[in-house]
Amino acid sequence: MKVLIPFYSMYGHIYRMAEAVAEGVREVSGAEAVLRRVPETLPTDVLQKMGAVEPQKAFAHIPVCTVDELAAADAIIFGTPTRFGNMCGQMRQFLDATGGLWVKGGLVGKAGGVFTSSATQHGGQESTILTFHTFLLHQGMVLVGLPYAFAGQMRIDEITGGSPYGASTIAGGQGERLPSENELAGARYQGKYIAEIAAKLKG
């Protein structure tokens, strides 16, 4: 059973969360986690001005995702940073190329979920995941979030990402904050949970 994890990461926060999601997937017997980057749309000179070139070298070895890989997966867990309360443009452009899959019903019945990051605690994490869910529903996918069975969502002793809609992390205004252990635990839980649901759907 293949669980695809397509993500976009500018400074590495979503990449780290994607790794944690993959760790959770691999806890399920017979589940294979496949990490993929979605294509970059920004020119190199713009990325340099944004200070993203060096951070992106850490995951440059991850292959770029293709639309065909979505159809071949048994479950898909998408990772995107928040951009003004929505998914990033790179992810949007990638998803806009899936019209052929929609026509064929290529994603119907597959388990799907989303994880995200934002600069601030209330920077649009939930709206990003919820608006992303619209795509999954149009494709006929089965939505899977991060249930409250993950007790880390109930913590009030620290600032942390995570909601019933999916795992998330807070990066800080300058990207200075790395995902906390609680946030990574949420990502692992979501990865494992979606893989378990996918296994049941696959029969």
Curated annotation (Swiss-Prot):
Q: Which family does it belong to?
A: Belongs to the WrbA family.
The coenzyme or cofactor needed here is:
FMN
Q: Which reaction equations make up its catalytic activity?
A: a quinone + NADH + H(+) = a quinol + NAD(+); a quinone + NADPH + H(+) = a quinol + NADP(+)
Q: What is the lineage of its organism?
A: Bacteria, Pseudomonadati, Thermodesulfobacteriota, Desulfuromonadia, Geobacterales
Q: Where does NAD(+) bind?
A: 11
The record's InterPro entries line, in alphabetical order, gives: Flavodoxin/NO_synth, Flavoprotein-like_sf, Flavoprotein_WrbA-like, FMN_Rdtase-like_dom, NQO
Q: What is this protein called?
A: NAD(P)H dehydrogenase (quinone)
- Under Enzyme Commission nomenclature, its number is 1.6.5.2
Please list the residues that bind substrate.
102
